[in-house]
Amino acid sequence: GIGISNTPQECGKELTQMYESNVNDVLISCGGGELMCEILPYVDFDRIKAAKPKWYLGYSDNTNFTFLQNTIADTASVYGPCAGAFAMKDWHQALVDTFDVLRGKGCKNNNGVVEKQVHGYDTWERESLKNEENPAPQYNLTEKKILRKYVGGDECDTEIAFEGRLVGGCMDCLVNLTGTSFDKVK
C-alpha cells in the first residue's frame, strides 16, 4: 500500500483497535483515497461487531468501511465530510448537520433506535477551491441539485416518501465490494 499511512496489515489492525478503544466516541477520517480496500482483509469485523457501536465518518474510499459497518456489524455510520472540511471558517449547513448527528442533536430515540430526519441541499460543489495557499476554503457551490425519480424504470413526477436506514456510499467502492467475501447484502 504505497499512498496510505502504513502497511495494509497495520492500517487494518489500527482501525480495529481504534474502533474498540474506550478513549474516543467517533472516528473521523482524514480523507478519501483509493487504497482502503487493501486493508479490509486485516480489519477484524468480528471484533468491530462485538465492540460498543460508535460513529465512523468519512466519504469516498471510506465507503469500504462505512458500508461494511452497516452490513456486517449492523451499526450506523455517516457517509459525509472528512476531518479537514471542519476547518473552514464558516461551516456550510451540511457540516452543521453532520456535527449535530455526531452529537445526537435533533435525534429522537424510538425504543432504542436513534432516528434523525435528513434532507439534501440546493447546490453542490463540482470543483473545490482547495490548494496549498487555501487549505480550508468554503464550499464552491456552483451546481444546482436536480433530482429525478424513477419507479420501475420510468421517470415519475409524483411525490415519493420512504423511511428506513439509508445505506450507500461511493459507487465504484460499492461495485468493487460486490461478490467479495465482504458482500453481506441480502
Could you say what each language-model-derived stretch is?
Residues 28-42:
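N-terminal glycine-rich "phosphate-gripper" loop used for MgATP/nucleotide binding
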Residues 25-26, 55:
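Short, Asp-centered acidic motifs that coordinate Mg2+ and/or phosphate
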Residues 76-172:
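Conserved anion/nucleotide-ligand pocket segment
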Residues 166-186:
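Oxyanion-binding "anion nests"
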Residues 32-34, 62-63, 172:
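Short glycine-enriched loops at secondary-structure junctions
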Residues 43-68, 76-84:
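Short, acidic/small-residue loops that bind anionic groups at enzyme active sites
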